[in-house]
Amino acid sequence: ALTVFLWTFAEREKIYDLFEQICGARFTTSYTRVGGVANDIDDHVLRQIRDYISKFPAELAKSEALIARNRIFIDRMAGVGYITQEQAIQLGLTGPCIRGSGIAHDLRKAQPYLFYDQIDFDIMTQNDGDCWARFKVRLEEMKECVRIIHQILDKLPEGPVMANDPHYVLPRKGEIYTRMEELINDFMLINFGTMPEPGETYTAIES
């Protein structure tokens, strides 16, 4: 009963190792910043990511083969937690939860952000609306994510990883000690934070 749990946790640890190499933290990554990301990714880490996703499908298939025929697991998932399409919409479900009820809604397609409009991928759905359907959606999405990651790595642009806007972005530490303007900008951002124009904005991302 613990075999799949241990196998999948081994994969989770490999992903956490990649997180750690990218930003220095395994779980509380804090990689994104206002205006960009904390630091660039070096070629060594990119090669490690490619190496990992080349091996991941085989590891996933191994776990799927073991659990997809497990009668106890299926009995505890199939026909349990049934959600109709109408209920899914009324409850405001997103991600695999709404797609497990047969609704092909994905913000990466419906309202593309970043450069998802340049990525070729399919929306995974199941029509049964139960826990088993949602599990199968998540399983298929992991397979589809391998395709997505390959494309993102191929399209990853070179250049700065942080915007150059003193109203929102902290100056580089080396400049604070040599330029008065940068020292003032650092002081204002640390003490008062960003001060956007009046108004509201909301941006949703896929769950």
Predicted regions and their residues:
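Metal/cofactor-centered catalytic core regions of large enzymes
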Residues: A1-S207
